[in-house]
C-alpha cells in the first residue's frame, strides 16, 4: 500500500500552499480513547498544526480534535500536544534536516490504515509570496487550457 493511502479523515490543504513539500513520512500517533472516537467521527482539524522535535521525540502541536460528544468528564483537551511515532533513524535524519534554514515539519493528512490513525508528515520549506503568486498563475493557466479543450470537444 503506498504512503498516504487509507480513509482520509482530515487534510491540511494550506500546507501545499505555504510550503514546498520535499519529503513525506508516515507516522503513528499516540491518542487517548475519546480522541480516536472523535477522529473516527471526522471531528479533527489540521489547519494550524505543526510538528516539532523535542528531546529526540516528535510532537504534534495545535491539532484540534473536538471533544467526544458521548464522553464523560474525563474527555480529552482538544489542543493537547500529541506524540508521533517514528523510527529512530527517521527522527535523526529529520533533526539534521530541520536544523537547516527554512525547513519545518508540517502534517499533511490524517488517515486510518488497518484500524490505526496515521499522520502523513511533510518536510517543507516555506514559500515566499512571489512563489505563491507564481503557483496561482500556473494553476489558472492550467484551468484555462482545460476549459478551452473541453469547449472544443463539445463543439464537435
Curated annotation (Swiss-Prot):
Cell compartments where the protein resides: Cytoplasm
Primary location group: cytoplasm
InterPro entries: SmpB, SsrA-bd_prot, SsrA-bd_prot_CS
Pfam families: SmpB
Any one GO MF annotation of this record: RNA binding
A GO CC term attached to the entry: cytosol
Description of what induces expression: Constitutively expressed, part of a 5 gene operon with multiple promoters. Not ethanol-stress induced.
Effect of gene knockout: Not essential for growth; loss of trans-translation. Significantly decreased growth at 16 and 52 degrees Celsius.
GO biological process: sporulation resulting in formation of a cellular spore; trans-translation; trans-translation-dependent protein tagging
RNA-binding found in the keyword field: yes
Keywords: Cytoplasm, RNA-binding, Sporulation
UniProt superkingdom: Bacteria
Family the entry assigns: Belongs to the SmpB family.
PANTHER family for this protein: SSRA-BINDING PROTEIN (PTHR30308:SF2), TMRNA-BINDING COMPONENT OF TRANS-TRANSLATION TAGGING COMPLEX (PTHR30308)
Function statement: Required for rescue of stalled ribosomes mediated by trans-translation. Binds to transfer-messenger RNA (tmRNA), required for stable association of tmRNA with ribosomes. tmRNA and SmpB together mimic tRNA shape, replacing the anticodon stem-loop with SmpB. tmRNA is encoded by the ssrA gene; the 2 termini fold to resemble tRNA(Ala) and it encodes a 'tag peptide', a short internal open reading frame. During trans-translation Ala-aminoacylated tmRNA acts like a tRNA, entering the A-site of stalled ribosomes, displacing the stalled mRNA.
Annotated protein name in UniProt: SsrA-binding protein
Organism per entry: Bacillus subtilis (strain 168)
Gene: smpB
